[in-house]
Structures are given as structure tokens and as C-alpha cells.
A protein has these predicted regions:
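Short, low-hydrophobicity acidic/polar segments
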Residues: 1-106, 132-151, 155-158, 190-192, ...
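Extended serine/threonine-enriched, polar tracts that run as long, contiguous segments within proteins
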Residues: 83, 137-216
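Surface-exposed, beta-sheet-biased, low-hydrophobicity segments with strongly acidic/polar composition
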Residues: 6, 14-17, 108, 119-127, ...
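Short aromatic-acidic-glycine turn motif
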Residues: 103-115
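Solvent-exposed serine/threonine-rich low-complexity stretches and specific carbohydrate-binding patches
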Residues: 112-141, 211-217
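Intrinsically disordered, low-complexity repeat and linker tracts
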Residues: 220, 224-267
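Solvent-exposed loop/turn and edge beta-strand elements of beta-rich ligand-binding domains
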Residues: 7, 13, 118-120, 196-198, ...
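Short beta-strand elements
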Residues: 28-56, 204-236
Length: 267
């Protein structure tokens, strides 16, 4: 140990394969401590899983503190997004094939906080083009209860950049259609599904899924798990026309527990 106090920083993952370096990197110097990350369409493209990126810091450490052991408490920098579903009526059944989220920021830089108990900050440039990330595909999920939610992605959560989502303003003339929502970079869900009520098909058929679109807005927070329960009734066409009774949301935010990993470092 040197005589002066030291600042320690740790990052998880610490190293990545060469082909992943374009998506993830970190920097820790005297003046700059930041993480750059680009989310991948993990469940659509399927080429790579997203990293649960974490950091830890211990500043002003000396040899006399903790018997010369540096203790780290890792914190998540991304937001976790999970979906469930219910039906609006007890005699309704929904079969889900695909869910996608359109038009959210998927890349940015996270600057570490000045102190370990701080929260840090994200900066992301505005979207340059419309895009969609997959929640599930080829899902074959049946939802047939209006009281108990059916799990969709609790075990396969999305990891996304924290941000405020602007929902598709389908009621406004300037953004009535899906194309206009894309041009305005407004957020919505794309859902390929079949909807039946008392056995009769209201959307799709026994052999065909139909696609509906649902305005989607919220604020994703760093280190939080956001759970969305879709209450199925219907949605909108790509021209912004209502299909049946549009889907409602029941949103919940829970703590995504920090990793209490004590990593012992003895310089």
C-alpha cells in the first residue's frame, strides 16, 4: 500500500470477447469514470445476451481500513423490464405469438457518481431511426384469466437503458398512424396475437395471428425491475384505428437487489 489514500473502481463484466467490445466498454481514470453500453436485441436476433452491467467503488481507502481489505458493493446500471398478461373478461382467451417494443433509446454512457452512495447518471443521444426490440417471439403463450396474471418474461427479462419513454400519441392528428409515431420516435408495443371470447374469434383465426399496436410510455429507472401486466381487450391498427377495446396496463416497479458481493482486493 502507498501512504496516500486510494480510490478503487470495479466493473462487471471486467473483460468481454473482442466481438462484444463495440457494445460494452468502461473507463476509469483520475478524471473520468464511465461505462458505455449498447443494448442488443437479445430475444430477436439471438446472437448475444445482454450483460447485467454493474459497477462498484470504494474511495479514499487506506491500508489501515478493514485490515487492508477493500470491500465492494456492486450496483446495476440498467433497468429490467418484465411482462405478464391477463384478459379483460373471464370468457376471453388470448394466444400470444410475438411482442416487440418500438422506439426507445438503446445506447448511452453511464457516468459513475462522485460518491459510492450516489446514483450516477445516464446520457443517451436521441434516436436516429425507428427500431424495435423483441420481448418474445414464437411464444405460443395462452392467457385465459382475468384475475390471475400469466407470466410472459419473468425468467427472460429485458435489460434496457434507463430512460423516459414517450408513448405513441394515437389520439393526436399529427401522430395518428404508426408511421407518424415512428417518425416522431414515439413508443408502442407490437403484439401478434389471437383473441377469442366465448370461443368466437374477435381477432385472428385458428390458423392466423393478427398484429395490434399499443401505446407504451413509462420511466425506466436504474437498478429497478419494471413489471407490466397487459390487460388484453384489443389495441390499434397501424393506422391508429381502435381494434376492440384497447389494452390497459397495470404497472409495478420493484427493487432489483444490488449484488452484495464483497470482493477482497489486497494491493
Amino acid at each position: 500500500w502507498p501512504s496516500e489514500a486510494l480510490d478503487f473502481y470495479a466493473f462487471n463484466p471486467g473483460t468481454v470477447s473482442e466481438d462484444m467490445m463495440v457494445f460494452y466498454s468502461w473507463e476509469a481514470t483520475k478524471d473520468v469514470q464511465k461505462i458505455s453500453y449498447t443494448c442488443m436485441d437479445e430475444y430477436g436476433a439471438g446472437t448475444h445476451a445482454n450483460y447485467d452491467v454493474m459497477y462498484a467503488m470504494a474511495k479514499g481507502q487506506t491500508k489501515d481500513m478493514n485490515n487492508g481489505i477493500v470491500k465492494f458493493n456492486f450496483k446495476h446500471i440498467l433497468s429490467q423490464v418484465v411482462f405478464k398478461a391477463k384478459t379483460q373478461y373471464d370468457n376471453m382467451q388470448v394466444d400470444i405469438d410475438v411482442i416487440k417494443i418500438h422506439n426507445f433509446k438503446f445506447a448511452g454512457a453511464f457516468t459513475l457518481p462522485a460518491a459510492a452512495d450516489g446514483t450516477g447518471s445516464w446520457s443517451s443521444s436521441d434516436l436516429a431511426f425507428p427500431h424495435a426490440f423483441t420481448v418474445v417471439k414464437n411464444a405460443n403463450i395462452t392467457v385465459n384469466s382475468n384475475t390471475e396474471a400469466t407470466d410472459i418474461t419473468t425468467n427472460t427479462p429485458m435489460l434496457n437503458i434507463p430512460q423516459e419513454l414517450t408513448a405513441w400519441k394515437v389520439s393526436e392528428t399529427a401522430t395518428k398512424s404508426k408511421l407518424e409515431a415512428d417518425n416522431a420516435k414515439q413508443c408502442y408495443l407490437e403484439i401478434a396475437c389471437k383473441i377469442r371470447q366465448s370461443g368466437a374469434y374477435l381477432l385472428g383465426s385458428a390458423s392466423e395471428y393478427k398484429t395490434i399496436y399499443v401505446p407504451f410510455g413509462d420511466t425506466w429507472e436504474q437498478g429497478k425491475r419494471h413489471i407490466y401486466t397487459l390487460i388484453f381487450g384489443g389495441g390499434y391498427t397501424d393506422q391508429g384505428e381502435a381494434v376492440l377495446n384497447p389494452i390497459q396496463f397495470d404497472a409495478e416497479t420493484t427493487g432489483w437487489v444490488d449484488a452484495n458481493s464483497n470482493v477482497n482486493v489486497k494491493p
